[in-house]
Amino acid sequence: LGFINLPNFNATISEGLATYTVDSFAPICNHVTETSVVLVKADSQFNTLEDLVKFAKDNPGKLKASTNGNRASNHIGAQVLATSAGFEYTDIPYGGTADQLLALRQGEVDFSVAKVADFASFTSEVKVLAVYNQERLAGYPDVPTMGELGYYDQWLGSSRCIVAPAGTPENVIKFYEDAFQKLMEDADYLKAAEAAGMETDYKNSADTAALIKQKQ
């Protein structure tokens, strides 16, 4: 079994950078759907997204963003923000989300795009300026959506899907599908997931297959 991350999984395939295709895998379930947010350091000069955008437009290319690598979900989020708001920035890719957000907290960059679970253990060290969703997040009711501010008005984030190799027998897929559903309905699991900032979102095998197709 393994995880795939949408939309990165499909983006890598569509750009010809993968040695596999969508048909190389058999979907089991979707585990988590995470919403992207715009982050700055807690003591940043930017208190609103409008502050950040104004600075970026007044100082083309000077604003720096840490990302988790080219074409990764957080890099896509930063690109979407810059495109929809109409500014230039300098992208600094790191080896992963942990390093990306460490750079933000150490003041090496001005902003980042990440998911809530990515910074759940150090929320006091960052400020959330906006969320990529049609509605405000329950955990951040005072933080506006991008659409409210006149920018990108759709959901953006990551869906974490569990898959098996193509050709895995249907009874095996069904076994794991049922097992993960049972796990994700467990009260202790749900409590732990909430504490970690995870947005659990179980989808069965058929619905996960449809989700993967939708993101192509």
Tell me what each language-model feature is:
Residues 1-4:
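Periplasmic-binding protein-like
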Residues 6-17, 75, 79-84, 106, ...:
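A ligand-binding cleft/hinge motif common to bilobed small-molecule-binding domains
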Residues 7, 12-99, 146, 157-192:
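Hinge/capping helix and adjacent helix->loop/strand transition within the periplasmic-binding protein
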Residues 48, 107-108, 125, 150, ...:
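Conserved functional loop/turn residues at catalytic and ligand-binding sites
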Residues 99-100, 118, 207:
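Short acidic active-site motifs
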Residues 189-202:
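C-terminal capping/gating helix-and-loop segments adjacent to ligand/active sites or protein-protein/ligand interfaces
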Residues 204-216:
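Extracellular/periplasmic bilobal clamshell ligand-binding domains
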